[in-house]
Amino acid sequence: MADMSLTIITPERTVLRDAPADAVVVPVVDGSMGILKNHAPMVANLRIGVLRYKQDGVYKRVAVTGGFVEVSENRITVLADAAELAESIDVMRAMEAKRRAEARLRDRKANIDRTRAEAALRRAMVRLRAAGALDHDKD
Protein backbone atom coordinates (compact mmCIF):
# COMPACT_ATOMS: atom_id res chain seq x y z
CA MET A 1 0.00 0.00 0.00
CA ALA A 2 1.39 3.37 -1.02
CA ASP A 3 2.13 5.89 1.68
CA MET A 4 1.67 9.03 -0.42
CA SER A 5 -0.24 10.37 -3.39
CA LEU A 6 1.20 12.19 -6.40
CA THR A 7 -0.64 14.65 -8.61
CA ILE A 8 0.97 16.25 -11.67
CA ILE A 9 -0.81 19.14 -13.37
CA THR A 10 0.19 21.22 -16.39
CA PRO A 11 -1.62 24.24 -17.83
CA GLU A 12 -3.15 21.93 -20.46
CA ARG A 13 -4.12 18.86 -18.45
CA THR A 14 -3.83 16.69 -15.38
CA VAL A 15 -1.12 14.10 -16.07
CA LEU A 16 -1.58 12.14 -12.82
CA ARG A 17 -4.22 12.51 -10.13
CA ASP A 18 -3.67 11.02 -6.68
CA ALA A 19 -1.39 8.28 -8.00
CA PRO A 20 -0.20 6.08 -5.13
CA ALA A 21 3.53 6.47 -4.48
CA ASP A 22 5.95 4.97 -1.98
CA ALA A 23 8.74 7.39 -2.92
CA VAL A 24 9.16 10.33 -5.30
CA VAL A 25 12.37 11.85 -6.69
CA VAL A 26 11.96 15.28 -8.25
CA PRO A 27 14.46 17.33 -10.27
CA VAL A 28 14.86 20.60 -8.38
CA VAL A 29 17.01 23.58 -9.32
CA ASP A 30 19.93 22.51 -7.14
CA GLY A 31 19.87 18.75 -7.81
CA SER A 32 17.37 16.00 -7.11
CA MET A 33 15.23 15.65 -4.02
CA GLY A 34 13.81 12.44 -2.62
CA ILE A 35 10.45 12.50 -0.88
CA LEU A 36 9.30 9.76 1.48
CA LYS A 37 6.34 9.33 3.81
CA ASN A 38 5.93 12.11 6.40
CA HIS A 39 8.26 14.51 4.57
CA ALA A 40 8.24 18.01 6.02
CA PRO A 41 5.92 20.42 4.22
CA MET A 42 7.76 22.37 1.52
CA VAL A 43 7.64 24.03 -1.87
CA ALA A 44 10.52 23.90 -4.37
CA ASN A 45 11.28 25.01 -7.93
CA LEU A 46 11.53 22.25 -10.51
CA ARG A 47 14.05 22.16 -13.31
CA ILE A 48 13.85 20.32 -16.60
CA GLY A 49 14.41 16.68 -15.70
CA VAL A 50 12.98 13.25 -15.02
CA LEU A 51 10.62 12.86 -12.07
CA ARG A 52 10.57 9.30 -10.74
CA TYR A 53 7.99 7.77 -8.46
CA LYS A 54 7.88 4.32 -6.93
CA GLN A 55 4.61 2.44 -7.23
CA ASP A 56 4.23 -1.23 -6.30
CA GLY A 57 8.00 -1.63 -6.08
CA VAL A 58 8.66 -0.21 -9.56
CA TYR A 59 9.92 3.26 -10.43
CA LYS A 60 7.93 5.06 -13.10
CA ARG A 61 9.17 8.13 -14.95
CA VAL A 62 7.73 11.44 -16.02
CA ALA A 63 9.54 14.06 -18.11
CA VAL A 64 8.94 17.51 -16.58
CA THR A 65 10.01 20.91 -17.85
CA GLY A 66 10.04 23.23 -14.89
CA GLY A 67 7.43 24.40 -12.44
CA PHE A 68 6.94 23.77 -8.73
CA VAL A 69 6.51 20.88 -6.33
CA GLU A 70 4.59 21.09 -3.08
CA VAL A 71 4.69 18.49 -0.31
CA SER A 72 2.08 18.54 2.43
CA GLU A 73 0.56 15.75 4.54
CA ASN A 74 1.89 12.93 2.32
CA ARG A 75 0.46 14.57 -0.80
CA ILE A 76 2.89 15.63 -3.51
CA THR A 77 1.55 18.13 -6.02
CA VAL A 78 3.58 19.05 -9.08
CA LEU A 79 2.59 22.11 -11.10
CA ALA A 80 4.72 21.71 -14.22
CA ASP A 81 5.13 23.82 -17.33
CA ALA A 82 4.88 20.53 -19.24
CA ALA A 83 4.92 16.87 -18.21
CA GLU A 84 4.77 13.60 -20.10
CA LEU A 85 4.50 10.05 -18.77
CA ALA A 86 7.31 7.81 -20.03
CA GLU A 87 4.89 5.46 -21.76
CA SER A 88 3.33 8.38 -23.66
CA ILE A 89 6.59 9.67 -25.13
CA ASP A 90 7.04 9.27 -28.87
CA VAL A 91 10.70 8.21 -28.88
CA MET A 92 11.17 8.73 -32.62
CA ARG A 93 9.81 12.25 -32.37
CA ALA A 94 12.06 13.00 -29.38
CA MET A 95 15.09 11.63 -31.25
CA GLU A 96 14.27 13.83 -34.23
CA ALA A 97 13.92 16.88 -31.95
CA LYS A 98 17.31 16.05 -30.43
CA ARG A 99 18.89 15.70 -33.87
CA ARG A 100 17.42 19.04 -35.03
CA ALA A 101 18.59 20.88 -31.91
CA GLU A 102 22.10 19.42 -32.19
CA ALA A 103 22.28 20.39 -35.86
CA ARG A 104 21.20 23.96 -35.06
CA LEU A 105 23.83 24.22 -32.34
CA ARG A 106 26.57 22.85 -34.64
CA ASP A 107 25.81 25.30 -37.45
CA ARG A 108 28.04 28.25 -36.57
CA LYS A 109 26.93 30.22 -39.64
CA ALA A 110 23.22 30.11 -38.90
CA ASN A 111 21.67 33.03 -37.08
CA ILE A 112 19.95 31.05 -34.31
CA ASP A 113 18.82 31.72 -30.80
CA ARG A 114 21.31 29.51 -28.95
CA THR A 115 19.36 29.66 -25.71
CA ARG A 116 16.23 28.31 -27.40
CA ALA A 117 18.21 25.62 -29.23
CA GLU A 118 19.91 24.53 -26.00
CA ALA A 119 16.54 24.40 -24.21
CA ALA A 120 15.08 22.31 -27.05
CA LEU A 121 18.02 19.91 -26.76
CA ARG A 122 17.55 19.63 -22.96
CA ARG A 123 13.83 18.91 -23.39
CA ALA A 124 14.50 16.24 -26.01
CA MET A 125 17.17 14.60 -23.85
CA VAL A 126 14.87 14.54 -20.81
CA ARG A 127 12.07 12.98 -22.85
CA LEU A 128 14.47 10.31 -24.12
CA ARG A 129 15.79 9.62 -20.60
CA ALA A 130 12.27 9.36 -19.22
CA ALA A 131 11.35 6.92 -21.98
CA GLY A 132 14.45 4.84 -21.24
CA ALA A 133 15.83 5.44 -24.73
CA LEU A 134 19.30 6.54 -23.60
CA ASP A 135 22.10 4.45 -22.13
CA HIS A 136 22.23 6.36 -18.85
CA ASP A 137 19.68 7.33 -16.23
CA LYS A 138 20.88 10.76 -15.11
CA ASP A 139 18.59 13.76 -14.74
UniProtKB/Swiss-Prot annotation:
SUPFAM superfamilies: Epsilon subunit of F1F0-ATP synthase C-terminal domain, Epsilon subunit of F1F0-ATP synthase N-terminal domain. Its main location: membrane. Keywords: ATP synthesis, Cell membrane, CF(1), Hydrogen ion transport, Ion transport, Membrane, Transport. GO terms for cellular component: plasma membrane; proton-transporting ATP synthase complex. The keyword Membrane applies. One of its GO terms (molecular function) is proton-transporting ATP synthase activity, rotational mechanism. It is a peripheral membrane protein. It holds the Pfam family ATP-synt_DE. It is found in: Cell membrane. InterPro entries: ATP_F1_dsu/esu_C_sf (IPR036794), ATP_synth_F1_dsu/esu (IPR001469), ATP_synth_F1_dsu/esu_N (IPR020546), ATP_synth_F1_esu_C (IPR020547), ATPsynth_dsu/esu_N (IPR036771). Belongs to the ATPase epsilon chain family. Produces ATP from ADP in the presence of a proton gradient across the membrane. NCBIfam families: ATP_synt_epsi, PRK00571.1-3, PRK13446.1. F-type ATPases have 2 components, CF(1) - the catalytic core - and CF(0) - the membrane proton channel. CF(1) has five subunits: alpha(3), beta(3), gamma(1), delta(1), epsilon(1). CF(0) has three main subunits: a, b and c. PANTHER family: ATP SYNTHASE DELTA/EPSILON CHAIN (PTHR13822), ATP SYNTHASE EPSILON CHAIN, CHLOROPLASTIC (PTHR13822:SF10). This is ATP synthase epsilon chain.
